[in-house]
């Protein structure tokens, strides 16, 4: 992409409109001045640029050519035009390498930093967390060098998100902690609020429930009840109490939230009833648990189909816990169909593991082997080597019990190859 100097723009525009230098003459603009500007012997002044732009527009009108031009275009340097071009490109959904090439050529630091940040967003959306992290880090280095500190909290937040989504929760906490400190320093309350939620979530993931609960309380100070994240934070709070066995407190939180949602088919109500179903199940209250799951199922079937698989697969445990395996299997399979439709990897895995446990309980070896192979494919697709190793070991033991030495050996070899 070539960007023209002011002198080149005048010359190229004049030729395009089939004008001679004398056609641009005016009371205060001589042909000699035009010639000197076109040969870079004189700089283009603003008052001259205004007059030339008017001449060009007038000629374009005579030729019936749609032609947008003004003095700002004529006065801009190649670097300024390059910056405008790159900014427009960065607004698009596709971020290509041409942008960084132009930014490097003209040393456009703001464009470079923005390019790497957008590239990070693109990699993050594609779940390429390592490359997303690298690009956010590149962006942050440029902003730091350029003393543009206001964006730093956001970039540390994004770097933490990369680590958290890659299940590296301790690493994520390091970046989230830095993000929180910078967000306070630069009075970025929006990022400060966001990062507190994710800090709490990471603490829960690594079983530090007391720290998670303390962080949630800090987060709730920033929240208002019209914000969905107010509910998400309370969901997280309830889940922490569930994890430490305080089921009644967890139930009380959900019941309180339920009263704050007036719409009978709010998707958040589906989540609340689903989790109440899980809590009552953990307490051994199968009747109330089933009632809650059925309410959640009705809501999600109407307004939140992408999460319907969660309710179905969680609901199946009401039946498997009471050894009603036929009904449990039927419900799990319905959940798996929904999970497949909405590409829900977590619940595809969860549902198949539920089937695995049932088939183990009823000693259905044929179906047990089938579901193990399904799980293996899911784990391979997501590079989950640690669980895959355990699964291959389980399969090899099943084959050994059947005296199928070759199949058992094949599973052990597959397990070994994961680490080669």
Model-derived features with residue positions:
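Short alpha-helical DNA-recognition segment
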Residues: 17-36
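Amphipathic alpha-helical segments of tetratricopeptide repeats
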Residues: 100-104, 137-144, 177-187, 217-224, ...
